[in-house]
Amino acid sequence: MAVMPPPNSVNGSERRYLEDGIWQHGRFYGSWKPGKYLFPIDSEELNRLDIFHKVFLLARDNKPFQAPIQRKAPRMMDIGTGTGIWPINVAEECFTDAQIMAVDLNQILPALIPPGVLPKQYDIEEPTWDSLYTDCDFIHMRMLLGSIQTDLWPQVYRNIFEHLAPGIGHLEHIEVDWTPRCDDDERPANSAFEKWAELFFDGMDRFNRIARVVPQETRQLLEATGFTDVKQEMIRAYVCPWSSDRQEREIARWFNIGLSHSLESLSLKPLVEKLGWKPEDVRKLCTTAKRETCVLRFHTYCNIYVWTARKPGPPQ
């Protein structure tokens, strides 16, 4: 039986998806197929997902996607849609006649959405996607590492391939590499952020849900699936706005906010349930890491990876 937070702690829209949730480690998690999705679905997490939508827009010239779309009324899918901010953005500003299926294990979209956006509760780890759109012009997915069983990634890519339109169907996949990096000596000694990342990756490995970005393996997997025109883009995101470059500073401001929200959300379950940490100790580590990532003299950054690919074949 789900334990609800105090009545005055949630508003009406939140209560719509929290009523069937599970209260664990001080956060709210989805209860449909429990254990499949290891991250919260509470208001703080929804804010985090929307913040990263802004990060990705800033990092990509304010474009929600870059693939060429040939049909005027395209059919699209957003896999792991979260709050639905991406399909809503596309439907309102790019293709008002598009049909966009917003697919997720948890239905946490807002009540008011554009008419072309179709919410779909679905487990993308299923062997086949029989009830999802086919003949798609575009399939979008982002920040799904850690959400998919490690050995099921080839199957997920095969299903995406099968649901794209031959010749004109494109995939775009975006991930954040949470590995802290620094190209100079301006890095903290005994970094709490580095410790957090190592523990997070370890815990997720023990769940058999890899969270590490391995760029070459992803590219090879896309090519092995049958995709052509496979391209990989890497975008640097500093964890605080120290850079003299205006765009880098703006990306860093938003990435810092998103990272601050991510530390606890991502690491609570893996550290508590697989590494034996207490929730309060996880929060202490996250607080220390947050403080570290706000120090301007530290030049730490993370990489954002974007893979794009096309399904070959004559258009039908």
UniProtKB/Swiss-Prot annotation:
Its main location: nucleus. Methyltransferase that performs automethylation. No other methyl-accepting substrate has been identified yet. Component of the velvet transcription factor complex that acts as a global regulator for secondary metabolite gene expression. Controls the expression of the mycotoxins trichothecenes and zearalenon gene clusters. Negatively controls perithecial induction, but positively controls virulence toward the host plant. GO terms for molecular function: methyltransferase activity. It is found in: Nucleus; Cytoplasm. One of its GO terms (biological process) is methylation. InterPro entries: SAM-dependent_MTases_sf. Keywords: Cytoplasm, Methyltransferase, Nucleus, S-adenosyl-L-methionine, Sporulation, Transcription, Transcription regulation, Transferase, Virulence. The keyword Plastid does not apply. Belongs to the methyltransferase superfamily. LaeA methyltransferase family. It catalyses: L-methionyl-[protein] + S-adenosyl-L-methionine = S-methyl-L-methionyl-[protein] + S-adenosyl-L-homocysteine. One of its GO terms (cellular component) is cytoplasm. This is Secondary metabolism regulator laeA. Disruption phenotype: Strongly reduces expression of the transcription factors TRI6 and ZEB2 that control the biosynthesis of the mycotoxins trichothecenes and zearalenon, respectively. Exhibits an earlier induction of sexual fruiting body (perithecia) formation and drastically reduces disease symptoms in wheat. Induction: Constitutively expressed under both trichothecenes mycotoxin production and sexual development conditions. Its EC number is 2.1.1.-. Component of the heterotrimeric velvet complex composed of laeA, ve1 and velB; Ve1 acting as a bridging protein between laeA and velB. Interacts directly with veA. The keyword Nucleus applies.
